[in-house]
Every structure is written in C-alpha cells, then in structure tokens.
C-alpha cells in the first residue's frame, strides 16, 4: 500500500507522507524540514538567475530559513492547518504546483524591502504628477504668462514649499536664479552675435549682387555693341548684293564711242516718245521705298528684371521744354523723344546717350512711333515723316553722327557738333495730305493710320507712299445719327481744352481700327468697308489714349477715368479714376501705367488690383523742389519710360 502511494505522487513528495504525524495529519518535524529544504533550494534556483548581486541571493536564502523556523513552531502549524478541511498532503498535491511556486516567488516581496520604501509626504497624487509632467499646449495657449511659463513640472522643492525656508535654502535658490540669469545673458549675447553675423552676410550678399548686376550690365552693353556691328555688316552685305547686278548690267551695255550724233535721232516718232518718256521718268524724283531691315535681337535685355519695382535705371535731361511724345522699341534699346523745343532726339537706352537728331519738320512733333528700325513722326506742320534708323552711320564715342575722321575738336566744339548733328541719311519720305496738325498715328506692317485736327483719319500704304483711304469722323457720326443709332457727336458741354485734340489716340491691327476722339467716344472702324463697326460710350471727356489686345481695350480720358472694355461684348469690364485728367496710358501683360497730372506715374496691377506710384515724386522731400509733372509714359516688358514737363526723361523698373 505504501509503495502504491509512493508511486502515485507526481511531485515526488509521497515519500514524506505517513499516516501518523503531528496533530494526527501524518506530517512530522522531519517532513517539514525536508519540505523547507526543497522550497529553499527551489526558490534559490529560481531567483538566483534574476539577481545581479550576491546580497540579493543571500537575502532570499535567509528569508526561506526564517520561514522554515516559523513553520516548525506548533502554534504556527495550528494556525495554518486549523482552517483546512483536507490534509497538508492533499493541499501540497493540489495547490503548490511548479508554475504557482515560481509565480509567487517572483511576485512576492519580503518585508525588509518594503520597509526601506520612504513614505511619500507629497500632497500630489500619482495621476496629478503625470499630468504635470506632460507638455500641455492648450494650457500655454490660454494662459500665456511669463511667470507660469516653464513652471508646470513638479520639482523636488515643491513638496517643501509649505515648510518654512531656511537661510541655506534661500541662498541655494538665489544661486540657482543667479546662474539662470547669467545663462540668460549669455544666450542674449549669442543671439545678438548671430544677428550681427546674419546682417554681415546680408550686406556681403548685397555687395555680391551689386557686383554681379554691374557685370550683367557690362555684358549687355557689349552685347548691344556686337549686335550693332553685326547689323552694320549685314546692311553692307545687302547693299553690295544690290549694287552688283547694277554694275553687271552697266558692263553688259558697252558705250560706242564711234556712234554718230544722228544715231540719237530716230525717224520713228513712237520711238522718240518712248525715249523722251524714259528720260523724263529718270529725272523725276521718286520717293524712297522703305526697306524693312529688322533688328536681329538674339537675346533680350534682362537687367531690369533684377531690380526692385519702382527702381530708377536712367535719368536723361532730354529736352528744354515739355515732352510731347516718346516711344522705344524694347528695354535698353532705342528711344525716340519729341518736345515743344521742336527737336526729335534718338537715344541709346543702354548707355543713356543721345545718338542724334531727326530734323525735317517745321513745327513740334505731337506723336511718334518706333517699330524695329522705322520711326514715324506726326507734326503740327500737318505732315507725317518716316525715318529708317538702319541707314544711320556709325556713332562716335562722343555721341555724334556723321563725324569726319580727320581732325580733332575741343570739348566745346564737340558739344556744339553734338547739338547740331542730324541723322540726315535716315529720312525716307513725307506723307502730306492733312490740312491741319497731326495729333495721333499708328502703323503696323505696311499700313499707317494718322489722325489730324482736320477731323479726318487717313490710311497710308507705306510701300507706295500714298494715301489709300480717308475716313471722315464727323460724317461717320452724322451717318450713325441719321440711321437712328445711339452713336452721335456729343459735345462735352464745356470750353475746349488746349490739350484736348480732336483725335486723341488710335491703334490699328490688320483691318481693325480703334479711335478715341474729343467727344469722349471710342469708335471701332472696319478698314475694309470704311465704316464704324461699333461705338463705345462711357467717357464724359475727351479720350487722350487707348490700347487694345485680343480681348480688352483700355482707354484714358480727361474725365480722370481709365476704362477697360470687353471687345467681345462692348461693355465695360472695369474702371477706376484718379484725381486729375489722364494724359497718357499704356499697359503690358501685368500692369497699366498712366500719367495723371502728377509728378509720379500711376501704376495699376492687373492681378490683384493694387494701385501704387512710381517715379521721382515718390518719397520726394516736401521742402525741396518738387519734380515736374509726368506728361507721357511708355511701358514694355516691365520697362517704364516717362517724359516730364521740364524735358527730363527717366527709365524705371515696373
């Protein structure tokens, strides 16, 4: 039977169980000692690998010895087994498994370790401490106080805040605050040093940028000179190619020195008439044809794109009186200006120097246009003259044209020569058909349209040099009134202004012509039929300037307003006004610039609708002399040129 019970014990403890023992349970002192040794060995085996110090292993060993001693006492045994209904053998068999013993040995802590834990006298709970240790952004947004900033974290001294401070603690706190204050000073000095370093870097970058801009300006000047020389060589080659067939034809027709005088007299009267007709036509003066020699720009100037908007590029004292007309072909290219001093000057915008004068008109020039090499000027002498700048001779270093290479002049003589030199070879021909001053003109391709104070518009063929069509503005207005239309001549109801021309502005494109007149109306003409296609009514004063593109037409008037029209519907797309009358206007892809009777150019940004001023009057000293009023403006690719009442012409970035 004993053998059978020993074999049934799966834990190997059946050899210590006997029917008789302490308290009638069969558990003797020898059995308890054996059980204690096994538990001690098992616990030491389980806990030793997790202990890193020898003291920890000895601690567990002594704890097990104490447990063994307690279990050997009869009182302890009675208390332990008094409440159990089963024998200790059954308890050990059913409850104390290997997994449970391992779990209890790991999770249980002795009283010695628990006795060393200090008592927490802090009034903060564990959860409150966890909340205080977090970076509470919402709290900082609501409570932005300098004192509470950075004071959310709990510190060791917070628990002792309620206790009375000792001098030692106060000195310690003072030293800590003093050190923090010193660190703040060091950090401020570091920030100041970084700011100075950044300022120095920015200044160095500005200097480097200025150096690169100067280098770019030099490259563009050199590029302009090379392109000018290349254009001259191309023109010479074309002239040689034209002269070569003429010389070959002259050589192919030999002159007979033995010819009789009677051979020049023919018996056939028809032949005599043919000969006389040919000789007459050879002696008649025929107008020179315009030969379009386009300027071959391989690259456009980009220097002005690197300046801030509103920066001045050049200022030239161009004339001695008010500027009446101004135009240029492209940025840093060729500019032509006219004024009431009866002069027309050609300028090189790249260097800001006058290259010559266009002389031939008997009065002041009121309007002009430059396209490639061709310049058209309309004057108060009722004529339109055309000039070909590609025929000009090489310009000397002192700005003179047609200067002889022989001889040297003094500075005064050079200045006088510069003032009297003209581009005489550039004159092509004159268009004389108007009977009053020409106030507006525009040409594109082989077609030129001119408007005059004689209340007519004339269409010119630049190839033949003659007028092909005359448009009567008054007749068109009367015709529209007779047909019952809403377009008729509408007097403004006030005294005519000296600057209010009958034809204030015009522009043509193929068969389309837009014309603004003194009655405040803008008429759209069809050059194929010579009829008014549409009339735009809106201005209450004379129209002084206009320009259109594919979709919109922009007009300026003496009624102080600028109106943007939709060409597709004929309605007003946008409008704005200034304090004084608008005398000149032009736009590009980004901005609309206007001269509105002030010493600044009015600029309107198309994208955001922002209005700002550009010119010498911006930031001018109120006590000093005020710049003159802007009379004429021209804008191309962000390059602005404005002419003033005192004759000064300036170039700006816009």
From Swiss-Prot:
GO cellular component, one term: transferase complex
Bilayer disposition of the protein: Peripheral membrane protein
Cellular compartments annotated: Mitochondrion outer membrane
Disordered: annotated segments: 1-20, 240-264
Coiled coil (UniProt feature): 209-253
PROSITE patterns: WD_REPEATS_1, WD_REPEATS_2, WD_REPEATS_REGION
UniProt keyword list: Coiled coil, Membrane, Mitochondrion, Mitochondrion outer membrane, Repeat, WD repeat
Placement of WD repeats on the sequence: 318-359, 360-397, 433-472, 478-535, 538-577, 579-614, 625-654
Role: Involved in mitochondrial fission. Acts as an adapter protein required to form mitochondrial fission complexes. Formation of these complexes is required to promote constriction and fission of the mitochondrial compartment at a late step in mitochondrial division.
Family of this protein: Belongs to the WD repeat MDV1/CAF4 family.
The protein's name: Mitochondrial division protein 1
């Amino acid at each position: 039977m004993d053998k059978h019970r020993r074999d049934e014990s799966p834990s190997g403890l059946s050899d210590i169980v006997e029917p008789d023992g302490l308290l009638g349970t069969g558990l003797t002192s020898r059995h308890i000692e054996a059980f204690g040794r096994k538990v001690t060995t098992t616990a030491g085996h389980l806990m030793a690998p997790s202990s890193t110090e020898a003291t920890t292993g000895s601690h567990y060993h002594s704890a097990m010895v104490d447990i063994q001693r307690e279990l050997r006492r009869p009182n302890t045994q009675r208390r332990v087994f008094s409440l159990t209904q089963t024998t200790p053998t059954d308890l050990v068999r059913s409850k104390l498994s290997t997994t449970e013993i391992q779990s209890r040995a790991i999770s249980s802590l002795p009283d010695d370790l628990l006795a060393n834990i200090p008592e927490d006298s802090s009034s903060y709970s564990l959860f409150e401490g966890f909340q205080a240790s977090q970076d509470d952004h919402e709290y900082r947004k609501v409570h932005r106080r300098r004192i509470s900033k950075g004071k959310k974290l709990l510190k060791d001294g917070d628990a002792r805040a309620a206790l009375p401070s000792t001098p030692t603690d106060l000195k310690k706190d003072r030293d800590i605050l003093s050190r923090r204050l010193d660190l703040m000073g060091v950090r401020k000095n570091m920030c100041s040093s970084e700011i100075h370093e950044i300022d120095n870097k920015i200044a160095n970058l500005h200097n480097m940028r200025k150096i690169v801009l100067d280098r770019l300006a030099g490259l563009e000047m050199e590029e302009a000179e090379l392109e000018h020389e290349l254009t001259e060589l191309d023109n010479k080659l074309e002239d040689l190619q034209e002269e070569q067939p003429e010389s070959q034809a002259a050589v192919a027709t030999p002159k007979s020195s033995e010819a009789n005088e009677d051979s020049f007299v023919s018996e056939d009267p028809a032949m005599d008439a043919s000969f006389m007709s040919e000789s007459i036509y050879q002696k008649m003066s025929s107008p020179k044809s315009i030969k379009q020699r386009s300027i071959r720009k391989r690259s456009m100037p980009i220097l002005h794109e690197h300046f801030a908007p509103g920066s001045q590029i050049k200022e030239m004292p161009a004339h001695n009186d008010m500027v009446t007309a101004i135009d240029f072909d492209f940025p840093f290219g060729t500019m032509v200006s006219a004024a009431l001093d009866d002069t027309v000057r050609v300028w090189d915008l790249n260097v800001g120097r006058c290259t010559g004068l266009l002389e031939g008109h008997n009065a002041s020039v009121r309007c002009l246009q430059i396209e490639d090499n061709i310049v058209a000027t309309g004057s108060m002498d009722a004529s339109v003259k055309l000039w070909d700048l590609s025929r000009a001779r090489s310009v000397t270093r002192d700005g003179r044209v047609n200067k002889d290479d022989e001889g040297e002049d003094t500075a005064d003589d050079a200045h006088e020569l510069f003032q009297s030199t003209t581009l005489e070879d550039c004159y092509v021909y004159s268009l004389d058909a108007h009977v009053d001053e020409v106030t507006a003109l525009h040409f594109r391709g082989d077609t030129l349209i001119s408007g005059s104070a004689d209340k007519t518009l004339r269409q010119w063929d630049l190839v033949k040099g003659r007028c092909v069509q005359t448009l009567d503005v008054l007749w068109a207005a009367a015709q529209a009134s007779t047909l019952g239309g809403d377009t008729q001549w509408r007097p403004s109801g006030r005294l005519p202004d000296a600057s209010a021309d009958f034809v204030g502005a015009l522009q043509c494109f193929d068969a389309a012509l837009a014309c603004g007149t003194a009655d405040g109306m803008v008429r759209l003409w069809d050059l194929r039929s010579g009829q008014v296609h549409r009339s735009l009514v809106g201005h209450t004063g004379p129209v002084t300037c206009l320009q259109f593109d594919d979709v919109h037409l922009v007009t300026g008037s003496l009624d102080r307003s600028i109106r943007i029209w939709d060409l597709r519907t004929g309605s007003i797309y946008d409008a704005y006004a200034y304090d004084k009358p608008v005398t000149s206007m032009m736009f590009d892809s980004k901005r609309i610039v206007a001269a509105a009777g002030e010493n600044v150019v009015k600029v309107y940004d198309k994208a955001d609708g922002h209005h700002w001023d550009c010119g010498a009057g911006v930031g001018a000293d109120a006590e000093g002399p005020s710049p003159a009023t802007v009379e004429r403006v021209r804008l191309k690719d962000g390059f602005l040129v404005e002419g003033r009442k005192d004759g000064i012409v300036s170039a700006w970035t816009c």
